Structure formats: C-alpha cells, structure tokens
C-alpha cells in the first residue's frame, strides 16, 4: 500500500528549516570526530536542504515492535512520561527498591566507627565509646596532631601534674623532657598502685607492658617507689634489647583506666603481696572502674583488650631472662573480657570474626558468578518495559532519487615547497542521491522509534521486490547504480541498498581543459562520500535507531 506524503508540509516553514539546521549541525559534528587524512586539514558543513522531490513510501507490514525498542532509561522515562501515573509509580517503586538494596548490600557496620579495631579509632570524635563508655573526652584532643592524645601520659591535660611532681619530684633527669619523665613516672606509679591494692601478677597488661624507666641517665631508676627491694626483677632485660619511640597508632587513652603508654622493653612483674597501704592514692583521672562481681579484680577484667590492642601494632622482643609469663595470659579470651569502650558498640573481635568466616561458607567463584547473574537479570528487568496491546510497528519500503543538497568545504594541504605549506578550501556540493531501503517505525506509548534495516534484514522482512535488478550501469568501484536519464531512476535500484548513488560537484581554483588544477580533489571527493555513507549507516541502520517524543 502506497502512502502519499506532503513533502512541502513536512520540510517547509519554520519547523522544516529548524529540522534542516539540526541535520546540518549533526553532520558537521560527526565530521569533526572523523580522523582526517594527511592531505585534508578540516571539513566544515555549511548548509543542508531537503529539496523538492519527495520519497516514495510503501507500507509492507504491521507487526509488534522490535525488542530493542523496549530498552529504556529510568531517568528519561521520568522526564518524558510525566503524564502516565502508572509508569511514574512503577519507576518510583523501582528506584526506592534499588536504593534500599544498595544500602543493605553496602555492609552493615561498614561505616560504623565501632567496627574499627581499637588502635584504628578516629580519635575523640569517632573513638569507640567516645562519650558513652568513658564519659566526656578532653576537648584538647580535637586539635592535637595525635588525635587521641593531647599530652602524652597525662589524661585530661595537666590537671594532675602536681600529683606526679609530689610523688616523683626527685626522679626527673635533665636529659629528658618533663612530659616523657612524667609519663614514665605515672606508669610506674600506676603499676605500683595496682599491685599494692591486691591485684595479682596475672594481669596481662602488666606483663606485656612492664613499667619502663625514664628516670636516670644510667638506666637505673632514681624515683622512690614502694617495695623498692621487689622492683629489681623489672630490669632483668638489658635496655638495648628492643626500643622504639611511641607512635601515634600505639598511644591510646582508655576512658576508664587512664592510659596505656608503649614500653621500650619487654619486662616481667613478679607477684606483689596485697597491701592496703602499699602505694599512693590514685589521682581523680585514674579512678578504679566499677565491677559488680569482684571489685578487687576489675583491672584484670579489662586488661586483655588493652593487651590485644597493643599487640596488634607492636613488635616485641623476647625476654633475655627466664620467662615469667603467667598461664592465664594465653587462656584469656576477648569474649570473657570485653573492652570497656564496647559498652555502646558491638564487640570488635566478634564482628571481625564474622566477616572473616562468612565468605568461607560458599565458594568465592560461585558467589561471584551468582552475584553477576543476579545483577545482569536485575539490569535486564530495569531496562525492559512492559509490552502493551496498543504497541505497534509499521514496516515501510522507502525509495528516493531526489535533489537533496548538502554543502561543505574541505581544506586541502599543499606539500610544495614544503609539507603542509598552505591550505586551499575545496567546495563540495552533494546535489542528489539515490536511496532504496526498508524502514521501521514503531510507536510505544508516547515514543516513536525509527530506523532502517540492513540489506539482509530488509530482504527477510519484505521479501524480493518486482523492481529489483542485480546489475546496471554505474560506477563499479563504488557500487552505486546510475539511474536512467530523467525521472527518479527507481527502476535501477536494489532493495536494501540504502545509499546507492551520491552526486557531488567540486569547485576549486580555475579549470584547464575541463580538468581540475589539483590532483587531490578526487581524493577529497571520495573521502567525503565515504564518510557520508558511514555516518548514515552508523546512525540510522538497525540496531541504531532514533527516538522521538510525541
């Protein structure tokens, strides 16, 4: 069935001129992305005209739309089909579902600071139990370069400095800084105070981090410490066995116990007899944490998490003397001794264990393949729209031999007297073309999709035509068929041949004996024609198609 097309109405008026300008700009943009040969500097498209000869359109079939026409983008659907309430609801539900899945698959606790190891906490603002487990942190920690420590060895600043000076006034050496000396004296006092109040020597942090000596120059302590005769085994190991400077990752403040500074040596602490008056009273910042079951063993209850924290960031040398490690050190488990900072957060060890053992439940390759298959299926469901009974597609045979015009210029580079010496513009005018192809026009809701079929698909869609010929006069190099003189020349076309002939005229300089003065003009013509054919096939031939909103 033939269809009469009012060509003047389609291509005339302001709308027709705007459409012609859009086609001109489109072809010009495509030429700018084409790699040019060495003898062509640039190509510019100046004008496009539809001409006055309309194409012949014949309706061949009405079928269901091609599956590719149902592939849509959610964003474009939301922007272009705002009038369809049903589609809007489907799009909104799908988007909310995908956002929920993204949050769930992101991993619970992935951005939760409580899931981080204690030695990787984010300081006073993001540390474990920063304000809940241990009370308010010192505000000076925020501006400190050591995140969690504003003054090494002194929790809460220097408010308790008078306490350390009163107890260890004679033990400071001039070769060390006051802060380092205070840190060492404070740690010695903490160990003596804890041991003097009935704590056994099985506390892991006391054996892992024995009291270092920062007092004298010769390595011997000059500070008066209770039970001085029992402190001699602390110095069994030579000071040169293992030393390291305190680093940012190994210095931490415990909100309940005060601090656990790093030790330069691995020392062992012998058991001290319980004494109610064996040491000075602790400062307010070192108040004993409350334990509901056994108040005399609260430090042993919280000591192992600190040991686990330090052990993960420190490299400790073996003791030179005989080992004096208590048997309870290796038997203590984090599940029996939770970190005091984990009161308001899940246990770090349990979380890490679950993460490390969960992938072992299934094969990594099987899990990856399954996830990939699910993603592909989800992507397919997201893109394909639901088919409806009112969706339709029309198949046309379109034949054209008209006076369509395309004006462009190409700059030819002259290689004399040197390479690329000067560029000369060549004016190329496409004055007509011969076309025979099969087009597809599909309407799905408020969208119209259009494309041409390749020669093989065209024959399969409409079959062999009566006016098709297998040969004819024309340019055998290009394969274009030359129509007979006059008329539209449709009798010499081939079904699905698409662009079968392009007529072009070139102008450059002066002509001598009917020949061009430059031999590269023919190369420019062939290059331009090849690019025009390539642009048409890449942009208009299926599976490429154009979509129009109606």
Curated annotation (Swiss-Prot):
The keyword Nucleotide-binding does not apply. Residues 76-97, 196-386, 466-489 are annotated as: Disordered. Keywords: Endoplasmic reticulum, Lipid transport, Lipid-binding, Membrane, Mitochondrion, Mitochondrion outer membrane, Transport. It is found in: Mitochondrion outer membrane; Endoplasmic reticulum membrane. Residues 288-305 have a biased composition (Basic residues). Residues 327-344 have a biased composition (Basic and acidic residues). Residues 270-286 have a biased composition (Pro residues). CDD domains: SMP_Mdm12. Its main location: mitochondrion. It is a peripheral membrane protein. Residues 346-355 have a biased composition (Polar residues). InterPro entries: Mdm12 (IPR027532), SMP_LBD (IPR031468). Residues 356-371 have a biased composition (Low complexity). Residues 1-550 form the SMP-LTD domain. GO terms for molecular function: lipid binding. One of its GO terms (biological process) is protein insertion into mitochondrial outer membrane. GO terms for cellular component: endoplasmic reticulum membrane; ERMES complex. Residues 83-92 have a biased composition (Acidic residues). HAMAP family: Mdm12. The SMP-LTD domain is a barrel-like domain that can bind various types of glycerophospholipids in its interior and mediate their transfer between two adjacent bilayers. Belongs to the MDM12 family. Component of the ERMES/MDM complex, which serves as a molecular tether to connect the endoplasmic reticulum (ER) and mitochondria. Components of this complex are involved in the control of mitochondrial shape and protein biogenesis, and function in nonvesicular lipid trafficking between the ER and mitochondria. MDM12 is required for the interaction of the ER-resident membrane protein MMM1 and the outer mitochondrial membrane-resident beta-barrel protein MDM10. Component of the ER-mitochondria encounter structure (ERMES) or MDM complex, composed of MMM1, MDM10, MDM12 and MDM34. A MMM1 homodimer associates with one molecule of MDM12 on each side in a pairwise head-to-tail manner, and the SMP-LTD domains of MMM1 and MDM12 generate a continuous hydrophobic tunnel for phospholipid trafficking. This is Mitochondrial distribution and morphology protein 12. It comes from Podospora anserina (strain S / ATCC MYA-4624 / DSM 980 / FGSC 10383). The gene is MDM12.
């Amino acid at each position: 069935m033939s269809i009469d097309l009012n060509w003047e109405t389609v291509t005339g008026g302001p709308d027709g001129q705007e459409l012609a300008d859009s086609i001109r700009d489109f072809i010009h943009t495509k030429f700018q992305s084409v790699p040019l040969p060495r003898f062509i500097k640039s190509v510019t498209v100046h004008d496009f005209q539809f001409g006055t000869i309309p194409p012949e359109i014949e309706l061949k079939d009405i079928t269901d739309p091609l599956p590719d026409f149902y592939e849509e983008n959610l964003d474009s659907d939301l922007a272009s089909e705002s009038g369809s309430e049903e589609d809007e609801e489907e799009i909104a539900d799908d988007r909310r579902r995908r956002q929920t899945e993204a949050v769930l698959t992101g991993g619970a606790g992935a951005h939760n600071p409580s899931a981080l190891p204690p030695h990787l906490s984010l300081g006073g603002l993001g540390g474990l139990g920063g304000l809940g487990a241990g009370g308010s942190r010192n505000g000076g920690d925020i501006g400190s370069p050591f995140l969690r420590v504003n003054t090494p060895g002194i929790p809460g600043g220097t408010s308790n400095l008078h306490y350390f000076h009163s107890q260890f006034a004679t033990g400071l050496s001039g070769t060390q800084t006051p802060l380092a000396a205070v840190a060492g004296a404070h740690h010695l006092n903490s160990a003596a105070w804890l041991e003097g109040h009935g704590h056994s020597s099985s506390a892991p942090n006391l054996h892992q981090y024995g009291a270092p000596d920062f007092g004298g120059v010769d390595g011997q302590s000059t500070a008066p410490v209770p039970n001085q005769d029992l402190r001699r085994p602390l110095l069994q190991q030579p000071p040169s066995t293992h030393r390291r400077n305190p680093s940012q990752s190994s210095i931490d403040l415990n909100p309940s116990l005060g601090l656990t500074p790093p030790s330069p040596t691995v020392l062992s602490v012998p058991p001290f007899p319980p004494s109610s008056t064996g040491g000075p009273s602790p400062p307010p910042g070192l108040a004993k944490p409350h334990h509901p079951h056994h108040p005399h063993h609260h430090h042993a209850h919280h000591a192992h998490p600190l040991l686990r924290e330090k052990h993960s960031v420190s490299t400790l040398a073996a003791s030179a003397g005989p080992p004096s490690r208590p048997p309870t050190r290796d038997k203590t488990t984090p599940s029996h001794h939770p970190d005091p900072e984990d009161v308001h957060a899940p246990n770090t060890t349990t979380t890490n264990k679950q993460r490390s053992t969960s992938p072992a439940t299934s094969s990594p390759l099987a899990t990856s393949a399954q996830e990939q298959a699910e993603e592909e299926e989800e992507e397919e469901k997201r893109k394909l729209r639901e088919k409806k009974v009112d969706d339709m597609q029309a198949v046309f045979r379109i034949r054209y031999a008209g006076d369509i015009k395309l004006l462009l210029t190409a700059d030819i580079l002259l290689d004399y007297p040197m390479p690329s010496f000067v560029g000369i513009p060549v004016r190329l005018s496409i004055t007509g073309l011969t076309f025979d192809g099969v087009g597809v026009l599909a309407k799905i809701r408020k969208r119209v999709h259009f494309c041409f079929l390749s020669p093989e698909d065209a024959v399969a869609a409409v079959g062999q035509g009566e006016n098709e010929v297998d040969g004819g006069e024309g340019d055998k190099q290009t394969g274009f068929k030359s129509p007979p003189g006059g008329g539209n020349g449709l009798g010499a076309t081939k079904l699905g041949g698409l662009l079968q002939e392009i007529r072009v005229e070139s102008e450059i300089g002066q002509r001598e004996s009917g020949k061009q003065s430059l031999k590269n003009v023919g190369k420019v013509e062939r290059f331009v024609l090849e690019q025009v054919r390539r642009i048409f096939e890449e942009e208009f031939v299926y599976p490429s198609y154009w979509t129009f909103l109606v």
